[in-house]
Amino acid sequence: PPPKERLHGRNSDWKHLYNADIISMPDKWEYPWYASWDLAFHCISLAIVDPAFAKRQLILFLREWYMHPNGQIPAYEWALGDVNPPVHAWAALRIYRIEAKRKGVADRAFLERVFHKLLLNFTWWVNRKDDEGNNVFEGGFLGLDNIGVFDRSKELPEGGHLEQSDGTSWMAMFSLNMLAIALELAREDKVYEDVASKFFEHFVYIADAMNNLGAECTELWNERDGFYYDVLHMQGHQIPIRLRSMVGLIPLFAVETLEYDWIKDLPDFLRRTEWFLQNRPDLTDDIACLQQPGSNGRRLLALVSEERLRRVLRVMLSESEFLSDYGIRALSRYYKANPYIVEAGGETYRVDYEPGESRSGMFGGNSNWRGPIWFPANYLMIESLQKFDYFFGENFRVEFPTGSGKMLTLWEVSLELEKRLCNIFLKDENGRRAVFGNTEKFQTDEHWRDHLLFFEYFHGDHGRGLGANHQTGWTGLIGKVLQQLGEYENTQPNRKFGVTINTTTDELLRAAGIEK
């Protein structure tokens, strides 16, 4: 038997766990252990080439010998009970749709199977992470490592708690993912209309809390700055953490566009949502909540209103803030010359813009969300912009980049961001790849220069690959990005992009093992 000191240590409450399966690893050398939120992104790329394996991977983590009896999905092997963003439902729905498009037949049994287990996971989140029952989610490590002012996996100053913009946004996104799955299942089984209504109401309550907690005087939306922030509560007072980071962009991930011709055939769901909108307008004033028809009569559910969407995008698409030649940075470049400093609990905390490797030892030091470009966040942002565009259509345009005077639709913006991600890997006019930086052997040696490495994350200014470098799983999302660009170029051969690349996508498609 193990020594007594191990009976109550790390992972001690996961005694049910029995893992002896083939699992997609984040990295076969530097991270040869599973991580559940990484896996969800792996499965999107895997679904292009092997949807059956991708589905089995998602199902596996919901089985009784993985999922905790209380509904928590194991986070990663070092600390199974840590908390990562709830993206399993999103991945399941995306894989379901990818396979349906590819094969012409949807695997309803798969979607139904994961949905029932994800109900347990959703309930765990609501019971464990909504500390005060006010639909604001706080506490714990949420996968963005050192992005915040504080180490969010440890005790905060003066025993305070952090009401997290990203934690609450992830739950709003989770609610909409579950709503979308329930509506898909309700097309053939009306029983799912009831649970769809449940997730609609969950979303509305979370969105209301996110935008204005009213009596608690907590607003995660900052009207002056036009951005979302965390709020630190300490001994009767609160401090807004006015740090412009990916934390304030994640609210855009909570979006779903619905076909009205589809939901009008679900009378119970439609009746309940219409009652809610008529009788609780106080909860829906600051969000997009089915009220107005959009392009082709579609309806929008989103955490951000149209006006707030424009304001957040104005910051995100500024090259002096988040927009890099290689994607969206995790932290605004503004802090390069203007470090963010806040005092709390008698201590001074500081965050600098660090586009390369972290100068902090937080989370081992070999990880950095204070400036670099990360594929999972960029991919979710691209997809969210496309969902918004599906509702708003041609008439909704924003400056890209901010201040340029060039107005693009959100679909066009999403494609420009995809091109910038591709620019990490593709050769520039001098035949050099940003991903290899100043490593001359990789840039020029004929035996190495065309062997692309999908690094963990990338330099926020130069695109150089950083962190783990041996085919890190979630950077494989570039394959899905390239597939979409390839399909679009085939249907729009004369389309001109604002970001010029000096080769077609064929090169990287081949490297990713994908044929156009």
Model segments located where?
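Acidic, mature catalytic/reactive cores of soluble proteins
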Residues: 1-516
